[in-house]
């Protein structure tokens, strides 16, 4: 917590090809060691592959995948009287998007394909069809929140 007032959130610029801020966030999350060109190439190649594979607009597939991966609830550890409870909380829209992108890339990274753009395209395709590891992660998170519903009154 800063002592000198509130820190303004920096807004990302929309990407040049699809004019979308979410795609920019995806590219920024793919990026390693400041190599944005490589990250853009991975992202755009994945989108190109999706276009070939599905015949649909890649942004439609991406948005469908994101909607299927973004969590509505999550659990947060809260310590009360020597016991730690997993308290279910609602996820803010900004964090929903961030978690969705993070889980999507983590799931893509664990896939068996040789190249990252194929891994990402495969995971996006799976997620848009409501299957895949990223969607499973969301379902597990929701299940955990549902199981700990009794502790919801400890919310903060």
Curated annotation (Swiss-Prot):
Keywords: Ribonucleoprotein, Ribosomal protein, RNA-binding, rRNA-binding, tRNA-binding. GO terms for cellular component: small ribosomal subunit. The keyword tRNA-binding applies. PROSITE patterns: RIBOSOMAL_S7 (PS00052). GO terms for molecular function: rRNA binding; structural constituent of ribosome; tRNA binding. GO terms for biological process: translation. It comes from the Bacteria. Part of the 30S ribosomal subunit. Contacts proteins S9 and S11. Belongs to the universal ribosomal protein uS7 family. PANTHER family: RIBOSOMAL PROTEIN S7 (PTHR11205). One of the primary rRNA binding proteins, it binds directly to 16S rRNA where it nucleates assembly of the head domain of the 30S subunit. Is located at the subunit interface close to the decoding center, probably blocks exit of the E-site tRNA. This is Small ribosomal subunit protein uS7.
